[in-house]
Amino acid sequence: MGRMHAPGKGISKSALPYRRSVPSWLKLSAEDVKEQIKKLGKKGMTPSQIGIILRDSHGVAQVRFVNGNKVLRIMKAVGLKPDIPEDLYFLIKKAVSIRKHLERNRKDIDSKFRLILIESRIHRLARYYKIKAVLPPNWKYESSTASALVA
């Protein structure tokens, strides 16, 4: 996938396995996977972190193939859905860290420019999530209150 603020076209992509059935060697049932997701979600992990742990520690390649639902949908059903989507959260976190850096290094012009790019990505993603009703329509990103969102 190509980058938004870079000249490269991007040819890298991941390929899902063709077989969509559960492997015969996998000992976890759908209910066990759901319990693991619930347990890891209560610890405060993001859906992608949960997926990585399930893949590396338990051998679950795709939660959707085992359970029929994605990690985020399972978390939503249990009531552990994050307040703001994961990708937006990490963009806000990055913007907050760059702002903190700029307080100490006022003359860092490149960081100022990168902050503008990151904040434009935040606004674009927030607009998308408002349309999809993931965020409330009155949600607004403000740099002054952003550190409270990611704390």
Curated annotation (Swiss-Prot):
InterPro entries: Ribosomal_uS15, Ribosomal_uS15_arc_euk, Ribosomal_uS15_N, uS15_NS1_RNA-bd_sf. GO terms for molecular function: small ribosomal subunit rRNA binding; structural constituent of ribosome. PROSITE patterns: RIBOSOMAL_S15. Pfam families: Ribosomal_S13_N, Ribosomal_S15. CDD domains: Ribosomal_S15p_S13e. It comes from the Eukaryota. Coiled coil: none annotated. One of its GO terms (biological process) is translation. NCBIfam families: PRK08561.1. This is Small ribosomal subunit protein uS15. It comes from Anopheles gambiae (African malaria mosquito). The gene is RpS13.
